[in-house]
């Protein structure tokens, strides 16, 4: 027997009465007030929960972002799938060691249309499926893009320097795009990884990584050398870059704190900051 829930029941408490109702139109208006302009290239990191009670959820956020940049603009979001990695490196949660060979053999290959994001949030997962969106081909660190420069943004994303040379991050840099942190801190700012590739800061290290490269309906495991990422100082670095960057803006979009800034200036300043202040030979947690 199927039981139906009566949505008219009067004993149900209204959802989140202490929060404002946030709509697509309001989000688009708030984005414009923050400084998002039609025709621009915008790399977005967004937290849906930080925005408040959004009518339409992640879909409304994606539509509002599209409204803000317009048809001549370009939106970009990271759509990482970190679970397409060697199971021996999994920590949250780990899996039994006797599972590793089976997982390596049976792992589905990356499919830009089918493979879901992992840990990227509802907005990024919704955005990658938007009409007209395209996704780069890196099995672990793909980006989705929509709009006038979408194809250019994702075209050169190879296996080496996954967030460096040829990556969508570098394409946003070339296009002099902006970054929008929407309810996120600088620890979510993937553009700082581009700076890590460009800077020979003290203590920079590399390691060997295994990447599952699609081969038909299976994967072939390829071992590559890559730099070790370090995000523990991203918030400090970001705040420092803000003090030296004219033209950035802080505000509120929905109920979320938001920061908008030029990516190119931030990456260049981050390179300088790492050279002067970062030493992974001494850093705790490196």
Swiss-Prot record:
Pfam families: Antibiotic_NAT
GO molecular function, one term: aminoglycoside 3-N-acetyltransferase activity
Membership in a protein family: Belongs to the antibiotic N-acetyltransferase family.
Enzymatic reactions: CMP-5'-(N-hydroxy-3-aminopropyl)phosphonate + acetyl-CoA = CMP-5'-(N-acetyl-N-hydroxy-3-aminopropyl)phosphonate + CoA
SUPFAM superfamilies: TTHA0583/YokD-like (SSF110710)
This protein's pathway: Antibiotic biosynthesis
EC number: 2.3.1.-
Residues at which acetyl-CoA binds: 45-49, 54, 122, 188, 190
Upper taxonomic lineage: Bacteria, Bacillati, Actinomycetota, Actinomycetes, Kitasatosporales
Protein name: CMP-5'-(N-hydroxy-3-aminopropyl)phosphonate acetyltransferase
Domain notes: The acetyltransferase fold is distinct from that of members of the canonical GNAT superfamily.
Phenotype upon changing residue 190 to A/C: Loss of activity with CMP-5'-3APn as substrate
Keyword terms, alphabetized: Acyltransferase, Antibiotic biosynthesis, Transferase
PANTHER family: AMINOGLYCOSIDE N3-ACETYLTRANSFERASE, SPBETA PROPHAGE-DERIVED AMINOGLYCOSIDE N(3')-ACETYLTRANSFERASE-LIKE PROTEIN YOKD
GO biological process terms on file: antibiotic biosynthetic process; response to antibiotic
Self-association and partners: Homodimer. The four molecules in the crystallographic asymmetric unit pack as two pairs of dimers.
Function: Acetyltransferase involved in the biosynthesis of the phosphonate antibiotic FR-900098, a potent antimalarial agent that acts as an inhibitor of 1-deoxy-D-xylulose 5-phosphate reductoisomerase (DXR), the first enzyme in the nonmevalonate pathway for isoprenoid biosynthesis. Catalyzes the N-acetylation of CMP-5'-(N-hydroxy-3-aminopropyl)phosphonate (CMP-5'-H3APn), leading to the formation of CMP-5'-(N-acetyl-N-hydroxy-3-aminopropyl)phosphonate (CMP-5'-FR-900098).
Highest taxon above the source species: Bacteria
């Amino acid at each position: 027997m199927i039981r139906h829930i009566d949505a008219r029941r009067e004993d149900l408490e209204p959802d989140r009465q202490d929060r404002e109702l946030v709509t697509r139109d309001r989000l688009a208006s708030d984005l414009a007030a923050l400084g998002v302009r039609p025709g621009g290239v915008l790399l977005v990191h967004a937290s849906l929960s930080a925005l408040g009670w959004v009518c339409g959820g992640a879909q409304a956020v994606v539509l509002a972002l599209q409204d803000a940049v317009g048809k001549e603009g370009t939106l970009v979001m990271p759509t990482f799938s970190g679970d397409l990695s060697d199971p021996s490196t999994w920590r949250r949660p780990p899996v039994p060691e006797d599972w590793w060979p089976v997982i390596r053999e049976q792992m589905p290959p990356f499919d830009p249309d089918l493979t879901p994001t992992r840990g990227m949030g509802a907005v990024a997962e919704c955005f990658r499926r938007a009409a007209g969106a395209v996704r780069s081909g890196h099995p672990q660190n793909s980006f989705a893009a929509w709009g006038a420069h979408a194809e250019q943004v994702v075209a050169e994303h190879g296996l080496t320097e996954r967030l460096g040379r040829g990556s969508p991050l570098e394409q946003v840099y070339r296009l002099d795009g902006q970054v929008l942190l929407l309810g996120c801190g600088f620890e979510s700012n993937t553009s700082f990884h581009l700076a890590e590739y460009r800077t020979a800061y003290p203590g920079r290290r590399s390691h060997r990584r295994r990447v599952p490269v699609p081969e038909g309906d299976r994967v072939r495991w390829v071992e590559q050398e890559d730099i070790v990422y370090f995000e523990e100082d991203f918030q400090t670095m970001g705040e420092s870059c803000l003090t030296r960057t004219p033209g950035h803006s802080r505000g509120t979009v929905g109920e979320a704190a938001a920061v908008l800034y030029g990516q190119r200036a931030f990456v260049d300043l981050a390179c300088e900051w790492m050279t002067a202040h970062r030493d992974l030979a001494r850093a705790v947690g490196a």
